[in-house]
Amino acid sequence: MNMIIATHNAHKIEEFGRILAPLGITMQTAELTEAEETGTTFRENAYIKAKSACDETGLPCVADDSGLSIDYLNGEPGVYSARYAEPGKRKATVLEKLKGVPEEKRGAHFTSAICCVFPNGDVLEAEGYCYGRIAEECHGESGFGYDPIF
């Protein structure tokens, strides 16, 4: 089965392809109109992107949305994780907002939602969570997004 992945992120394309290949699913990319992420949850945004791509291509489409939610900040940055603060300053912004906050109040979780929309209207969705704390400073040089502080 051929499936479109609604992303321009080369790492995600490679990762999805590797995971789905043993199931006989071939991931493809397409020049897609970027869907506006107007959802209030990660699951809604994943659906919006997958549905838009499916409508545009007529093929099964998969999309994801993910981000970091910090308890002390009432769930910020949440669905705005990729657009939170200025690019390159997101981690520093979080650390500044949590400056002086004790460890026991630095709880956070990472949410990842994935959605697959089929041309016949079928929808498959899943959501997962990883719980932890926000560090007081960045650790390590590798990692993606908020990884060095989570």
Give the role of each language-model region.
Residues 1-4, 11-150:
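Anionic-ligand binding patches
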